[in-house]
């Protein structure tokens, strides 16, 4: 199970390992289309309601794999506002293929026209907080209809990490998420499909452009159970001990002290509020000061 932040790390690591975001979007879209085919009958109408990010891009791809259905794609916004280059490429592919792709330029102009299936691809795992417009109005329209609703990655309006909604949220009948389950999906009253989209296992354990492998912690642990580290340095410069201390926090130690000259103590503290800064007398570190520093 991966949190939204951890999933972003895995995506970045996969790209560094040679699996491009474009490849992942193609695989994700194909996975969405497979779930739609499971819930729809041949000839059914399918409306894909899409955001302007990668989540919407997944649905643009899915639309190309749904030629057996009466498909309409509703982009919540203008084409020019689509944030990702690969998503814009897939929007252009829809237009080139003469698939019914519409720009929804204000929340009142969304017309779903009573489809049999709705694909909710407005917002993905990285979104938090209450839905804004036009997504809020679109979510209400989806919920008020009688269609089977398939959400991409997570129902829009639901926090992927907590399962909570800060306001209106899409009421999904099915959810298709990618690579691994997300913590917030366990609370949903809907079947969840976890689709393998070709992310290598090394993306979870290799340090690349994303981040270090996530750390597993006992939720009943106390501060200090995961290491106490003392960083000694500074004077007249603060960068080295401050960066070393911050890096130590990121690797998982939860009590990190930085012993540095008083002249740079405030600067070091400003790098991260999680650092415990011990201000030592003088402008440089010497043997006498080290003896007074402690973890």
Identify the role of each PLM range.
Residues 89-92, 166-170, 273-279:
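Short, hinge-like loop/turn segments at secondary-structure boundaries
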Residues 99-100, 173, 192, 275:
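Short, conserved active-site loop motifs that form the nucleotide-linked donor/cofactor pocket
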Residues 34-122, 132-151:
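Nucleotide and nucleotide-moiety/phosphate-recognizing core
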Residues 102-104, 151, 175-178, 257-260, ...:
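Short, hydrophobic beta-strand segments that form beta-sheet elements in well-ordered domains
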Residues 110-112, 168, 289:
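Structural alpha-helical scaffold elements that stabilize or flank donor/cofactor-binding regions
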Residues 116-230, 235-236:
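YjeF_N-associated NAD(P)HX repair module
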Residues 1-68, 72, 182-294:
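Small-residue (G/A/S/T)-rich helix-start motifs and N-terminal tracts that mark the onset
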Residues 52-54, 79, 107, 122-129, ...:
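Short glycine-rich anion-binding loops that position phosphate/pyrophosphate groups of nucleotides
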């Amino acid at each position: 199970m991966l949190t939204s932040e951890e999933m972003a790390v895995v995506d970045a690591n996969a790209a560094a390992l040679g699996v491009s975001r474009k490849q992942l979007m193609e695989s994700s879209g194909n996975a969405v289309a497979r779930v739609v085919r499971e819930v729809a009958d041949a000839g059914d109408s399918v409306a894909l309601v899409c955001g302007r990010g990668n989540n919407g891009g997944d649905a643009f791809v899915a639309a190309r794999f749904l030629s057996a259905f009466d498909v309409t794609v509703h982009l919540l916004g203008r084409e020019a506002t689509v944030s990702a280059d690969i998503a814009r490429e897939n929007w252009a592919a829809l237009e080139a293929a003469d698939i019914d792709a519409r720009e929804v330029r204000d929340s009142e102009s969304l017309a779903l026209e009573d489809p049999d299936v709705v694909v909710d691809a407005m917002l993905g795992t990285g979104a938090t907080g209450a839905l804004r417009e036009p997504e809020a109005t679109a979510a209400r329209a989806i919920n008020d209809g009688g269609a089977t609703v398939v959400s991409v990655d997570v129902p829009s309006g639901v926090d992927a990490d907590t399962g909570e909604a800060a306001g209106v949220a899409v009421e999904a009948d099915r959810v298709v998420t990618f690579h691994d389950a997300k913590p917030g999906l366990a609370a949903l009253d809907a079947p969840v499909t976890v689709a393998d989209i070709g992310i290598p296992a090394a993306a979870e354990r290799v340090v690349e452009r994303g981040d270090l492998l996530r750390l597993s912690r006992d939720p009943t642990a106390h501060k200090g159970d995961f290491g106490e580290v003392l960083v000694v340095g500074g004077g007249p410069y603060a960068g080295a001990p401050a960066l070393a201390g911050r890096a130590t926090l990121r690797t998982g130690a939860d009590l990190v002290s930085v012993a540095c000259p008083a002249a740079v103590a405030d600067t070091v503290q400003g790098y991260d509020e999680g650092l415990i800064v011990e201000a030592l007398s003088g402008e440089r570190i010497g043997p006498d000061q080290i003896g007074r520093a402690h973890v």
